[in-house]
Amino acid sequence: MLEEKKKQESFEIQRIYIKDVSFEAPNTPNIFHVNWIPTIKLNLNTTTKKIKENIFEVVLMVKVTVKIKEDLVFLCDIDQAGIFFIANINEKRLKHCLYSYCPNILFPYARTCISNLVSCGSFPQMNLAPINFDALYHDHIK
């Protein structure tokens, strides 16, 4: 019985934190008087690092660039990170966990931070749509 417990898959969130964040609005205050028809570009990336046995740092990097015509309205970058304990999972499931499951946990924190920064910059509310990290992961491994 004790042997079975040792081999049981384990996952635990140890910490979620902001590793880096920036907000730039270089064309204020003039941009406030421009007709609000923005183009929004979203870039996502995930990195992972094994800290020690069964302990991993996952960093979800989210970059939002908003322009009106060619003028930069704002640029928002966040590296939302987490430390996760993951044990007794085979390599294939571990990669899925690190590149799909963990970013899925981190994304709501990044989305909230971006929304707050944009609001504090005096721009219209920005609520990023949910991301299907599972689909992104499967597209990446093909």
Curated annotation (Swiss-Prot):
Listed under GO biological process in this entry are: protein folding; protein tetramerization; protein transport
Name the InterPro entries on file. SecB, SecB-like_sf
> Which keywords does this Swiss-Prot/TrEMBL entry list?
Chaperone, Cytoplasm, Protein transport, Translocation, Transport
The yes or no answer to whether the keyword Glycosyltransferase is present is no
Query: Which is one GO molecular function term here?
Result: unfolded protein binding
What is its subcellular localisation? Cytoplasm
Can the keyword Transport be found in this entry's annotation?
Answer: yes
Q: Which Pfam families did the record assign?
A: SecB (PF02556)
Any one of the GO CC terms: cytoplasm
Protein family (similarity comment) = Belongs to the SecB family.
Q: Describe its partners and assembly state.
A: Homotetramer, a dimer of dimers. One homotetramer interacts with 1 SecA dimer.
Protein purpose: One of the proteins required for the normal export of preproteins out of the cell cytoplasm. It is a molecular chaperone that binds to a subset of precursor proteins, maintaining them in a translocation-competent state. It also specifically binds to its receptor SecA.
Instruction: Tell me what this protein is called.
Output: Protein-export protein SecB
Encoding gene, per UniProt annotation: secB
